[in-house]
Regions:
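Phosphate/pyrophosphate-binding loop motifs in nucleotide- or prenyl diphosphate-using proteins
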Residues: 1-137
């Protein structure tokens, strides 16, 4: 993995996968940064639960978020070299997760106040971060 610093004086610019440079304030950077933030919060939720299904599901979602962030952090040249682009099978996977959770917990009929335990609280924060990422796309 490359260093976290470049020592080149970025002047507010960052490189995309593929080599082009854009402003760090560009909406594209904000979008993939928000996905990274959601992924980190899922990691926190993962660390707070011992339930195998939840841990496996979080891990699978994290892998997909890494792929999504890579796509969002790429220019046209860079995206052509990526493996495992997000596709319909990923959407189906997430829909199945939602269906399984709904079967387990029942259909939501009212808003839930977060804070039951650390894992569920972290999942609620991750949910709101993902909603923000949606608005950024």
């Amino acid at each position: 993995m490359a260093n976290l610093y470049t020592k080149t004086g970025d002047k507010g610019q960052t490189s995309l996968v593929g080599g082009s440079r854009i402003s760090k304030s560009d909406p594209q950077v904000e979008c993939y940064g928000t996905i990274d933030e959601a992924n980190s919060m899922l990691g926190l939720a993962y660390s707070h639960t011992g339930q195998e299904y939840i841990r496996n599901t979080i891990h699978a979602i994290q892998g997909r978020l890494f792929s999504l962030a890579a796509e969002l952090a790429s220019d046209a040249e860079g995206i052509s070299g990526l493996k495992g682009l997000i596709g319909e099978e990923d959407v189906s996977f997430l829909e199945n997760v939602v269906d399984t959770c709904t079967e387990t917990t029942g259909k939501m009929t009212h808003f839930v106040i977060p804070g039951v335990d650390p894992a569920s609280s972290a999942l609620h924060v991750a949910r709101t971060i993902v909603r923000r990422a949606e608005r950024r796309m």
